[in-house]
Design a protein with these regions (language model features):
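Well-structured core secondary-structure elements of compact alpha/beta domains
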Residues: 1-29, 41-61, 87-128, 142-165, ...
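Active-site and NAD+-binding cores of ADP-ribose-processing enzymes
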Residues: 187
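Short, surface-exposed beta-strand/loop micro-motifs that present aromatic residues
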Residues: 178-180
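Short, well-ordered alpha-helical segments enriched in acidic and aromatic residues
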Residues: 35-44, 133-142, 240-248
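Glycine-centered tight-turn and secondary-structure capping sites
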Residues: 26-36, 68-81, 117, 126-134, ...
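Internal mixed beta-strand/loop scaffold within catalytic domains of large alpha/beta enzymes
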Residues: 63-72, 161-170
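Acidic/polar surface patches and capping/hinge elements
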Residues: 1, 67-100, 184
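Intrinsically disordered, low-complexity segments enriched in small/polar residues
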Residues: 74, 139-142, 154, 182, ...
Length: 257
């Protein structure tokens, strides 16, 4: 047999997290930009990515309430028992956008940044002037073939930096438009060739905080259990007094299996 010691958040722990979410919710209402940094700063378990997502990409408790919130408004705070969290969210924006986008690209990289920019500008100008995209791609050792990107490929992933910049460019570029995109040490000449499956999409900033026990609550539980062990130094005494002390006694038949 063994004793399973469950440490749960105290009323004080929950009240402290509730207060933090209340404060974060008030700040969320007045925040107008850089939601990524703000959501990170309040310790949310749901990071904000500055892309339009399908409704289903957000936590299920947010999805269930999304239609009750208008763009620019804040919903919550509310408790969600399914994941033991206190939450609020803000619908930052809503749009109708393609869920699948076809594109092609030419990656441009030269000896240094100035030469890279000059070469990229030259290729971009040529394509805008009517040059064949695939022929130019082959000239620089690439195929220029088209690829499809769907939202399922990036929704729910950790996206930032150049990846965010690249995906944003694909989403924001019109069909047949060409973009000269600086990415790190290189440039990408990007052309969107097709878009399909238009759906409602959202940008939603979510404050999601688990109601977890504090260090003080854990230390209290540890000390209480240590005192119980000291007062019941034998297995017989522990078994006899565990339930009265509030501990659950369990069988461990598979301990040596």
């Amino acid at each position: 047999k063994y004793i399973d010691v469950q440490v749960t958040a105290s009323a004080e722990d929950r009240a402290a997290i509730q207060q933090e979410v209340d404060e974060a919710t008030a700040q969320l209402a007045t925040t107008t930009d850089d939601y990524t940094s703000f959501i990170r700063s309040v310790g949310s378990e749901a990071p904000y990515v500055d892309l339009f997502y399908n409704k289903t990409a957000f936590p299920s408790d947010v999805v269930a309430r999304l239609d009750s919130a208008s763009v620019g408004s804040v919903y919550g705070p509310y408790y969600n028992g399914a994941d033991n969290t206190i939450n609020s969210f803000k619908v930052v924006a809503k749009t109708a956008a393609a869920d699948s986008i076809e594109f092609r690209q030419i990656q441009v990289f030269a000896e240094d940044a100035l030469k890279t920019k000059a070469l990229a500008d030259s290729i971009y100008t040529a394509i805008k002037g009517g040059a064949n995209f695939a022929d130019l791609a082959k000239k620089y050792g690439q195929t220029g073939e088209t690829n499809w990107m769907s939202s399922a490929q990036y929704e729910g992933a950790q996206i930032d930096g150049d990846n965010l910049k690249f995906i944003s460019a694909i989403n924001n570029t019109g069909v047949n438009e060409v973009v000269n995109l600086p990415l790190g040490q290189a440039n990408v000449i990007l052309q969107v060739t097709n878009k399909k499956a238009v759906k409602d999409k959202y940008k939603v900033a979510v404050v999601k905080r688990e109601v977890e026990f504090s260090k003080e609550t854990y230390n209290r539980a540890y000390n209480d259990f240590s005192q119980f062990i000291a007062a019941n130094p034998t297995a017989e005494k522990m078994i006899a007094n565990a339930e009265e002390a509030g501990y659950k006694l369990l069988d461990r038949r598979d301990l040596y299996s």
